[in-house]
Amino acid sequence: MGAVEGLTEFLPVSSTGHMILTGHLIGFDDDRAKVFEVVIQLGSILAVVVIFWKRLWSLVGIGKVTDGPSLNLLHIIIGMIPAGVLGVLFHSAIKEVLFGPGPVVISLVAGGILMIVAEKFSKPSTARTLDEITYKQAFTIGMFQCLALWPGFSRSGSTISGGLLARVSHTAAAEYTFILAVPMMVAASGLDLIKSWDILSTADIPLFATGFITAFVVAMLAIVSFLKLLSRVKLTPFAYYRFILAAVFYFFIM
């Protein structure tokens, strides 16, 4: 499960869908499994921190990535606001209504359609690099990140699609998505971990540590490979994969 999490967390294929399917197939889907998923997700987040550490330092005023105008902390805050507000207001409702096999199948298909539409109707990029993203584009991407509150939609799938429609290049949208994910995922995972702390025991440490490390290593490889691949293959192949996954999900889980 650590490998599945690391591979799918930052690809536009829905890590949630893969984790539910994997947990079902191996018979690991109880409350302890849910805490395990939170822990290995933190391993994936650490991979982003390691890969983009210079950029993250620059956001808090330590060091500069470029001499000219560059991505700053306000870009990240603006991108966080829409999903952050909705997540806080409707956290319980989202958990109760959208966390289930049926909604996940629907979101897998809907997310795939969004990606195809974004590729078809996107215009030439005005922001080809991360440092050319405007505040308006950051807010647009943040609005599309709200879709990721629906399990199965995929954070990267929805935000990269939003970036394309806002005239941000594939690579710049993906890099912004990964950086934007750090505070959002740390906050969400931290909250879930605190709420589930009483489920953990010292006997779980070896299992959780193995999953954490595996997710970290695989996520490192997945992020680097995805950024190299994205400029050549675009989002469409991932959209078709989502349709296949939705069919598998429907027949094996529902």
UniProtKB/Swiss-Prot annotation:
<keyword id="KW-1003">Cell membrane</keyword>
<keyword id="KW-0812">Transmembrane</keyword>
<dbReference type="GO" id="GO:0009252">
    <property type="term" value="P:peptidoglycan biosynthetic process"/>
</dbReference>
<feature type="transmembrane region" description="Helical">
    <location>
        <begin position="174"/>
        <end position="194"/>
    </location>
</feature>
<keyword id="KW-0046">Antibiotic resistance</keyword>
<keyword id="KW-0133">Cell shape</keyword>
<keyword id="KW-0378">Hydrolase</keyword>
<keyword id="KW-0472">Membrane</keyword>
<keyword id="KW-1133">Transmembrane helix</keyword>
<feature type="transmembrane region" description="Helical">
    <location>
        <begin position="133"/>
        <end position="153"/>
    </location>
</feature>
<keyword id="KW-0573">Peptidoglycan synthesis</keyword>
<dbReference type="GO" id="GO:0050380">
    <property type="term" value="F:undecaprenyl-diphosphatase activity"/>
</dbReference>
<dbReference type="GO" id="GO:0046677">
    <property type="term" value="P:response to antibiotic"/>
</dbReference>
<dbReference type="Pfam" id="PF02673">
    <property type="entry name" value="BacA"/>
</dbReference>
<feature type="transmembrane region" description="Helical">
    <location>
        <begin position="207"/>
        <end position="227"/>
    </location>
</feature>
<dbReference type="InterPro" id="IPR003824">
    <property type="entry name" value="UppP"/>
</dbReference>
<feature type="transmembrane region" description="Helical">
    <location>
        <begin position="8"/>
        <end position="28"/>
    </location>
</feature>
<dbReference type="GO" id="GO:0071555">
    <property type="term" value="P:cell wall organization"/>
</dbReference>
<dbReference type="GO" id="GO:0005886">
    <property type="term" value="C:plasma membrane"/>
</dbReference>
<dbReference type="GO" id="GO:0008360">
    <property type="term" value="P:regulation of cell shape"/>
</dbReference>
<feature type="transmembrane region" description="Helical">
    <location>
        <begin position="33"/>
        <end position="53"/>
    </location>
</feature>
<comment type="function">
    <text>Catalyzes the dephosphorylation of undecaprenyl diphosphate (UPP). Confers resistance to bacitracin.</text>
</comment>
<keyword id="KW-0961">Cell wall biogenesis/degradation</keyword>
<feature type="transmembrane region" description="Helical">
    <location>
        <begin position="74"/>
        <end position="94"/>
    </location>
</feature>
<feature type="transmembrane region" description="Helical">
    <location>
        <begin position="233"/>
        <end position="253"/>
    </location>
</feature>
<protein>
    <recommendedName>
        <fullName>Undecaprenyl-diphosphatase 3</fullName>
        <ecNumber>3.6.1.27</ecNumber>
    </recommendedName>
</protein>
<feature type="transmembrane region" description="Helical">
    <location>
        <begin position="97"/>
        <end position="117"/>
    </location>
</feature>
<comment type="similarity">
    <text>Belongs to the UppP family.</text>
</comment>
